[in-house]
Amino acid sequence: WKIQTIANTSQLQFDQEFGNTFFGTGDTLINAESLMKLKAKNPIEALESGNLLIYEKTQKNHAYIMTVDVSKGRGQDYSTFTIIDISASPFRQVAVYRNNVISPILYPNIIYKYAKVYNDAYVVIEANDQGGIVCNGLYHDFEYENMYLESAVKADKIGVEITRKSKRIGCSSFKDLLENDKLEIVDQETIMEISTFEARGQS
């Protein structure tokens, strides 16, 4: 029965439904009640060798935002992006990309491709460490201008520099959106990650 149920849903949904794992205990950033409401969906399509999961196709006249995290591409941390439909409340997660071997030099190609697919999505890239390479590649090489800039004049001011302050603001905004049902997250891996976010001190 358990195997059949998991096959028809997912391990995450089974654990949520039947109490094997209780998310949101301890000092998680998002409260338990909100975490329990999150329901993973199956993607309607997998592209880019399975690294890109599509949950909703692009809709005409809809506005999208793409948030981008960059890793070194050496098989450890993942370079990821999430595409959110921000046309109406609640906002909806519509696509997720994850790849732990893509080089920061090649990553702008993928970002550009799907930012264009999703109606020239507004792109926000974490500029720390390898992120600067990706920011400059997208903005200067691809001449993609619909992205967050701290300054268009200074080369190192493209994207968002993650500091303790900006992380605190970002986490607070994310918490507000989720706990007030203003954002729907449907990707299983994303839900698992959200469930382990911990609130630690001032950061």
Question: What does each model-found stretch correspond to?
Answer:
Residues 2-152, 156-164, 168, 172, ...:
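RNase H-like, metal-dependent nuclease domains and their acidic two-metal-ion catalytic environment used
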